[in-house]
């Protein structure tokens, strides 16, 4: 397969399939120092997540961004998986309820009386070439235990998942901890060597 490249100025351009600049900066930092011009996706690009797995959803987003920009594109999809709920909410984490408070309250209600609190955040990250074809994928998992009440107000599932190694909730992890312990950080670090090889980065 022919390898295509997209250049912005003198640097290869990589599109992160999100419109959130904070997430773009977060993923760029997680990938480590790379000679890339990292950009977010076009503002008017809106991809419906119709996949049946995290990977399928990530591929939909990365492929659409790659085809629109003509550049390599990276996307991720993630969710909270609760053992006592047979992996729910999983793929439907973002749509589990309207708003963070409602999501937290629904999870806590469904776990009433259950002694089993183990859960994890799972993320899958994919890389698509400019033709929209998926060329690499990686997964990251952060295990923890769900608290009986959120650690702080206004947070979502991340305010409930206690990460024992960090001695705080997922939502309280700092940037370095997110890269080392977080599910997205683990996926990004696992994908980085493949990205370097595919894009011929030194």
List the model feature ranges, each with a label.
Residues 2-15, 22-202:
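Anionic-ligand binding patches
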């Amino acid at each position: 397969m022919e390898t295509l490249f997209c250049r912005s100025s003198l640097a290869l351009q990589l599109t992160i399939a999100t419109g959130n600049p904070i997430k773009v900066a977060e993923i760029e930092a997680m990938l480590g120092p790379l000679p890339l011009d990292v950009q977010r996706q076009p503002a008017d690009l809106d991809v419906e997540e119709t996949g049946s797995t995290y990977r399928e959803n990530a591929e939909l987003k990365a492929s659409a961004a790659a085809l629109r920009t003509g550049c390599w594109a990276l996307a991720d999809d993630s969710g909270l998986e609760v053992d006592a709920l047979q992996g729910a909410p999983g793929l439907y984490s973002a749509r589990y309820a309207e708003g963070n408070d409602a999501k937290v309250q629904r999870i806590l209600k469904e776990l009433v009386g259950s002694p089993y609190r183990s859960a994890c955040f799972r993320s899958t990250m994919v890389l698509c070439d400019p033709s929209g074809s998926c060329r690499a994928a990686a997964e990251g998992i952060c295990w923890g235990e769900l608290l009986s009440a959120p650690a702080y107000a206004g947070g979502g599932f991340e305010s409930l998942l206690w990460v024992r190694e960090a001695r705080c909730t997922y939502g309280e992890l700092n940037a370095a901890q997110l890269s080392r312990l977080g599910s997205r950080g683990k996926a990004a670090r696992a994908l980085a060597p493949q990205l370097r090889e595919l894009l011929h980065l030194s």
